Amino acid sequence: MKAIVFVLIFAVAFAVTLRQGPIVCNLCTGLINTLENLLTTKGADKVKDYIDSLCNKASGFIATLCTKVLDFGVDKLIQLIEDKVDANAICAKIHAC
């Protein structure tokens, strides 16, 4: 019985992860594109402010994305954007895609 419950819990957790994958990936690439524009026009400090503001009020899929971004590191993220790394590649690096 315990084995069946464990398998069911694992299956549900795996299904939720798969389902949120494309959503978080799309949110990530959109966020990276926004941050790229913000970095070009306003600078790194504004990018950090934007991420702080977004993540402080985030929930759901956006909170998931914020966790991935913050775990990766905002300074490293900014460096990748400055190095003109593609949004899809950045999101893959932070495990959002």
Curated annotation (Swiss-Prot):
<keyword id="KW-0732">Signal</keyword>
<feature type="signal peptide">
    <location>
        <begin position="1"/>
        <end position="20"/>
    </location>
</feature>
<dbReference type="InterPro" id="IPR008139">
    <property type="entry name" value="SaposinB_dom"/>
</dbReference>
<dbReference type="InterPro" id="IPR008138">
    <property type="entry name" value="SapB_2"/>
</dbReference>
<protein>
    <recommendedName>
        <fullName>Non-pathogenic pore-forming peptide amoebapore A</fullName>
    </recommendedName>
</protein>
<dbReference type="Pfam" id="PF03489">
    <property type="entry name" value="SapB_2"/>
</dbReference>
<feature type="disulfide bond">
    <location>
        <begin position="25"/>
        <end position="97"/>
    </location>
</feature>
<keyword id="KW-1015">Disulfide bond</keyword>
<feature type="disulfide bond">
    <location>
        <begin position="28"/>
        <end position="91"/>
    </location>
</feature>
<comment type="function">
    <text>Forms pores in the cell membrane of host cells. Implicated in the cytolytic activity of the parasite. Pore forming activity is lower compared to the activity of ameobapore A from the pathogenic strain HM-1:IMSS.</text>
</comment>
<feature type="site" description="Essential for homodimerization">
    <location>
        <position position="95"/>
    </location>
</feature>
<dbReference type="InterPro" id="IPR011001">
    <property type="entry name" value="Saposin-like"/>
</dbReference>
<feature type="disulfide bond">
    <location>
        <begin position="55"/>
        <end position="66"/>
    </location>
</feature>
<comment type="subunit">
    <text>Monomer. Homodimer. Hexamer; formed during insertion in the membrane.</text>
</comment>
<feature type="domain" description="Saposin B-type">
    <location>
        <begin position="21"/>
        <end position="97"/>
    </location>
</feature>
